[in-house]
UniProtKB/Swiss-Prot annotation:
DNA-binding region, residues: 70-129
The name this protein goes by in its record: Homeobox protein ceh-9
InterPro entries reported in the protein's UniProt record: HD, HD_metazoa, Homeobox_CS, Homeobox_TF, Homeodomain-like_sf, HTH_motif
Keywords assigned by UniProt, alphabetized: Developmental protein, DNA-binding, Homeobox, Nucleus
Molecular function via GO: DNA-binding transcription factor activity, RNA polymerase II-specific; RNA polymerase II cis-regulatory region sequence-specific DNA binding
Region of interest (Disordered), ranges: 128-147
Amino acid sequence: METDLLFQLLQPYFALLTSDVKPQRRTSHLIKDILDLPTVNGEIDEFGRCKSSLDQAKESPIEKCQKTKRKKARTTFSGKQVFELEKQFEAKKYLSSSDRSELAKRLDVTETQVKIWFQNRRTKWKKIESEKERSGEIPDDQIVKPQ
């Protein structure tokens, strides 16, 4: 009885499996044909590769270098600049835009350089503080200083 019920439930699926539908076969094994990718201005070679990328591969290393953006050199702060930045950091962990502008002018660097320096310094400071907490030391900001 259970077999009859199971057969009735699965009968529509058996019909799909046994139908005479023949799968379509592709004769081309090119990626563009398999994926039905639209061609860009018909610039596809006989192997299904984009011709413009082939042209780029023929560029000399010098030509490639000239096209790539150059990474800005890392800023090296002088001892005096680092001293002033550290002094400001001890006073304030976060600078206002006016403080940042004033400090940048005083140190002869850009505001962005000051901003990034403070971001990096805060990251270093937070890492040091969390290591102190894990080791059982009292973080600097929780030490009560006599006046």
